[in-house]
């Protein structure tokens, strides 16, 4: 045919059999990729430390999505929560991957069958004998079936009626596990962090989809609307489908980046706003205050802080710290976290407590500044020692650790104090193994960042695709250079040029 690369999809225009074939092949590729990627991730995933080396630190992308839907066990004998497993059953990580690969193979065979047997009676209009599709009817069928699926997911899978439930956690990502969820039908169902809204919204949207599907199956579109929206043209279907996909992509980019019940921090890592707002720092501070109010020593109070909570309060886990073109998992950046050194408390020689000002998200370097409880600068690591007034040496700053591996240890020599002050800029202080993976010390983003970036980019791309194909189908006559009021029939396809005066015409 000599088609240019950007027009190859015209081969499935007016060819319903092969249109089905290419969609089957596309689904086969998607399913095959998902299964293969899952097996690859399982091959490189280390489940030994779910606290300091969780899936999101290791750059896992499909494992978090399987986990949030209720898959937590492996045929390898491990569970995502750290327990050993004897019988994982079919719906393990490997089982789900295998099912996707088998499905991919079946879809591949179906695609070949439909490509070979493309000219079926089913696709021919009884009146004209030409290939045609009843697009409004097909729309109704698809709407009905997707409504059934949506309702089934919300009413059975999420609620645990027939299924495992979904991943549910506390606001600080400490107690996450898979459990059934009761639908939330009140105003609380609109809270993006309430998992009950996932169940109720799927049930409601499913019912709406079923009713809308039945409506479109039983009611024909008015002629004016049918013609106005070009409902007989398959490019209209392409245009509206792209619109649905780009809208969904924009929505999930937002829910992933800003966080919601469907994107828990245990599976995808913290959001950047939790660092910006000191979210975990405030919770740690609240717990310490409560412990001290109960006459518990500072050392004991900090020892009660879960290592998991302290690790969230570290800038290296902020997805906005990794550059978009720094490939690799977080562990390839600052290394594999080995242990929490403890909370560093800085004091001047008078015994006043000083607080290291934390690095904002979009800074790579930041001055080391220590302030008192009123926010007044009391000490720093100066850029020019000759002009310094508040240097660690001049102010006589010391550091003592509470909780963690250095619990009860204090340092007063300036070099060590400066070292820990620099590290305290980045939140809680952890020890990292950079040798195992040859980590380069440059922060990476988490799967939360990659997912958001990918979906935002594709949504923008698909938005323009929607405008393009929508314009093509609505203004087809204009682009073809044909006046819709023309009283002569034009033989399409005989000439390549638009508006060619030599095109064969036949007066009606």
Curated annotation (Swiss-Prot):
It comes from the Eukaryota. One of the components of the core complex of photosystem II (PSII). It binds chlorophyll and helps catalyze the primary light-induced photochemical processes of PSII. PSII is a light-driven water:plastoquinone oxidoreductase, using light energy to abstract electrons from H(2)O, generating O(2) and a proton gradient subsequently used for ATP formation. PSII is composed of 1 copy each of membrane proteins PsbA, PsbB, PsbC, PsbD, PsbE, PsbF, PsbH, PsbI, PsbJ, PsbK, PsbL, PsbM, PsbT, PsbX, PsbY, PsbZ, Psb30/Ycf12, at least 3 peripheral proteins of the oxygen-evolving complex and a large number of cofactors. It forms dimeric complexes. It comes from Zygnema circumcarinatum (Green alga). The keyword Membrane applies. Binds multiple chlorophylls. PSII binds additional chlorophylls, carotenoids and specific lipids. Its main location: plastid. This is Photosystem II CP47 reaction center protein. PANTHER family: PHOTOSYSTEM II CP43 REACTION CENTER PROTEIN.
């Amino acid at each position: 045919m000599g088609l240019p690369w950007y027009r190859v999809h015209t081969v499935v225009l007016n060819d319903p059999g092969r249109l089905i074939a290419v969609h089957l092949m596309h689904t086969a590729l998607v399913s095959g990729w998902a299964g293969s990627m899952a097996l690859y991730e399982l091959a490189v995933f280390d489940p030994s430390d779910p606290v300091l080396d969780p899936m999101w630190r290791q750059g896992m992308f499909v494992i978090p999505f399987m986990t949030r839907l209720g898959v937590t066990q492996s045929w390898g004998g491990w569970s995502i929560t750290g327990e050993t497993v004897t019988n994982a059953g079919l719906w393990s990580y490997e089982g789900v991957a295998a099912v996707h690969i088998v499905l991919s193979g079946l879809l591949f065979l179906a695609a070949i069958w439909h490509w070979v047997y493309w000219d079926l009676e089913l696709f021919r209009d009884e009146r004209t004998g030409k290939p045609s599709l009843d697009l409004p009817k097909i729309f109704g069928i698809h709407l009905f079936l997707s409504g059934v699926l949506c309702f089934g997911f919300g009413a059975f899978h999420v609620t645990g009626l027939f299924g495992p439930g979904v991943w549910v956690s506390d606001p600080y990502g400490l107690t996450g596990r898979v459990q059934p969820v009761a639908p939330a039908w009140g105003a609380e169902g609109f809270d993006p962090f309430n998992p009950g809204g996932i169940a109720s919204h799927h049930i409601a949207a499913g019912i709406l989809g079923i009713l809308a599907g039945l409506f479109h199956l039983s009611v024909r579109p008015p002629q004016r609307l049918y013609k106005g929206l070009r409902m007989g043209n398959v490019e209209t279907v392409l245009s509206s489908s792209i619109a649905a996909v780009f809208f969904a992509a924009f929505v999930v980019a937002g829910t992933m980046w800003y966080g919601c019940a469907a994107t828990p921090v245990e599976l995808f890592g913290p959001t950047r706003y939790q660092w910006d707002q000191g979210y975990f720092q405030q919770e740690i501070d609240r717990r310490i205050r409560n412990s001290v109010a109960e006459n518990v020593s500072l050392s004991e109070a900090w020892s009660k802080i879960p290592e998991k909570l302290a690790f969230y309060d570290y800038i290296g886990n902020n997805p906005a710290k990794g550059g978009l073109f720094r490939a690799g998992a977080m562990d390839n950046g600052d290394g594999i976290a080995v242990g929490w050194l403890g909370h560093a408390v800085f004091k001047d020689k008078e015994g006043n407590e000083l607080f290291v000002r934390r690095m904002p998200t979009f800074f790579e370097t930041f001055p080391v500044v220590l302030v008192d409880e009123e926010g007044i600068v009391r000490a720093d690591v100066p850029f020019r020692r000759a002009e310094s007034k508040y240097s660690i040496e001049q102010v006589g700053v010391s550091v003592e650790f509470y909780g963690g591996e250095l619990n009860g240890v204090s340092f007063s020599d300036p070099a060590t104090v400066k070292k820990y002050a620099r590290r305290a800029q980045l939140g809680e202080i952890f020890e990292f193994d950079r040798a195992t993976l040859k980590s380069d010390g440059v922060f990476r983003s988490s799967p939360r960042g990659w997912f958001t970036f990918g979906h935002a980019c594709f949504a923008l791309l698909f938005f323009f695709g929607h405008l393009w194909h929508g314009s093509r189908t609505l203004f087809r006559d204009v682009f073809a250079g044909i006046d819709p009021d023309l009283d002569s029939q034009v033989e399409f396809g005989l000439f390549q040029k638009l508006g060619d005066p030599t095109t064969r015409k036949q007066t009606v």
